Amino acid sequence: MDIKEFAQKTIQRFGTHDPFDICNQLGIVILYLPLGRMRGYCYSNENGKAVVLHGGLAEHEARVVCAHELGHVLLHPNLNRIYLDTSTFVCERKLENEVNAFAVCLLFPDDNELLENCSTISELSIYMGVRLELAQLRSMYIGV
C-alpha cells in the first residue's frame, strides 16, 4: 500500500482528516511544551502513546506537526523518533519522507481541489500553507 492510499484509508477509518481528532480516537495524548528549536516528537511507553508539540506553534503549523507525528505512530509504531526542525527541512531519510508524505496526504486529501487551484509547486505550497518541500511531496501524487 502506498502512502497516499494509507492516508486515505486512515481518513475513512476515522471519519476525519484532522490529526488531532484521529489522535483522540486512538487515545494518543497530545501535550504542548516549550521545546526550543524542536517542533514536536512522539513516544510510547507502558502508559500509552503521546504526541508532544512545541507550545509556541501557530495552529496551522501545529496541525502539520501533529499529522507528521501521527504518521510516525501509524507507519512506524515500534520506533520512538524525534522530529527536528532544520532551516531547510530537507529530510532525505526514508522514514521522514514517508511521514511527511503521509502528513500532507492526510491534511490535503482532495487531488481535484489541489489541481483546480494550483499549477506549480510554489502555488501548491502557498495554497496548502506548508513549506515547499512538503508541497513537493504532495505534488508527487497529483502531477503538479
What are these regions (language model features)?
Residues 1-144:
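Active-site hotspot residues in diverse enzymes, especially metal/ion-binding acidic/histidine motifs
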